Amino acid sequence: MPANLKDGPLKQHSVYVIDDDRDVRRSLSFMLSAAEIRSHPFGSGLDFLEALPDLEPGCILLDLRMPQMDGFEVMDALAERKVDWPVIVMTGHGEVPVAVRAMKLGAVDFVEKPFSEQALLGCFNQAFGLLKDREAAGRRRREAHERAALLTGREKEVLRSLLAGQSNKEIAQSLGISLRTVEMHRGNMMDRLQASSLAEALTLALEAGIEPAQAPAG
């Protein structure tokens, strides 16, 4: 196994194996254990979803053809719960159209049974890189929301106007306040957002979901 697979992001997260075939679960758990990757097997999608609230973020290896609740239904349930962990789907040989359907629903990759250890670990390596990026983006959004929550109403109005591309003079006119007052609110806004530049402040605003102000009528 390449060193970058064994020592990279794979060792930092868990793999959740969802397959109704006990032999497949055992085989995959053995393979992942040999690669020093934490694995957690589930015999059904229902079992996984029941345990989901207590699980740490990880990669999901999902069989599409299962009784009671198939892989597509599991993916729908994850979307409803706003869980965006990377999903790799397992398909039978020649079931590429089925895999394509799964990828349209959000799966990041697919493997055909029987699959090689090298191919599967390669999929995991890419999936965990994606998970790391998503987690970082989530942290940035949360931090942006926390900082934006510190803004006063007037400071947020100034920020929304800046997002709309207005100058300080235009903001003063649209809000009916003096230019000096706009500059004061803008400075306070920058301090509360801990932004060192206007570009950084606007990026934080967008990550916090703040919408640009509407253009003044007339």
Can you name each region flagged by the protein language model?
Residues P9-D23, L28-L32, G45, I60, ...:
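Conserved acidic segment of CheY-like receiver
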Residues E50, F72-D84, R101:
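Short amphipathic alpha-helix used as the core "switch/output" element in two-component signaling
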Residues G187-G218:
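Basic, Lys/Arg-enriched C-terminal extension of HTH/homeodomain DNA-binding domains
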